[in-house]
Amino acid sequence: MIPLSHAFSLSIILFILGLIAIIVRRDLLFILLGLEIMINAAASAFVIVGSFLGQSDGQIMYILVITLSASESAVSLALLLQLYRRYHTLHIDNISEMRG
């Protein structure tokens, strides 16, 4: 069995990578990918704790989080598609300048 500290370290590293993707990139698609990485890192922490405690609650929470993440992805990708059709770019700075 993997030690708890190693598993949490992996989850924290994934969360930080997602956060860096959100902060550094200015493209909406990459920001959404970073958000999904962060959500999956948090969901994996539920599984890690549930596995450590010997309960299935962590796995149930993971299924719930993944379901919510899938619906969030569907809505955000639909909005992303509409933004691209209207402004022909996914760059955040260009879209915020076109406010009117």
UniProtKB/Swiss-Prot annotation:
Q: Which GO terms describe its cellular component?
A: NADH dehydrogenase complex; plasma membrane
Family matches, as InterPro entries: NADH_UbQ_OxRdtase_chain4L/K, NUOK/Mnh_C1-like
Question: Taking the first listed entry, what is the main subcellular location of this protein, grouped into a coarse class?
Answer: membrane
* Compartments (UniProt record): Cell inner membrane
Which GO molecular-function terms appear in the entry?
Answer: NADH:ubiquinone reductase (non-electrogenic) activity; quinone binding
Name the Pfam families for this protein.
Oxidored_q2
Q: Which enzyme class, named as a word? A: translocase
Question: Could you tell me what reaction this enzyme catalyses?
Answer: a quinone + NADH + 5 H(+)(in) = a quinol + NAD(+) + 4 H(+)(out)
SS bond list: none
Top-level taxon in the UniProt lineage = Bacteria
Q: What is this enzyme's EC? A: 7.1.1.-
Q: Membrane spanning segments where?
A: 4-24, 29-49, 60-80
The UniProt keywords, alphabetically, are:
Cell inner membrane, Cell membrane, Membrane, NAD, Quinone, Translocase, Transmembrane, Transmembrane helix, Transport, Ubiquinone
- Name the family the entry cites: Belongs to the complex I subunit 4L family.
Give the function comment from the record. NDH-1 shuttles electrons from NADH, via FMN and iron-sulfur (Fe-S) centers, to quinones in the respiratory chain. The immediate electron acceptor for the enzyme in this species is believed to be ubiquinone. Couples the redox reaction to proton translocation (for every two electrons transferred, four hydrogen ions are translocated across the cytoplasmic membrane), and thus conserves the redox energy in a proton gradient.
Q: How does it assemble?
A: NDH-1 is composed of 13 different subunits. Subunits NuoA, H, J, K, L, M, N constitute the membrane sector of the complex.
Q: What is this protein called?
A: NADH-quinone oxidoreductase subunit K
Q: Which gene encodes it?
A: nuoK
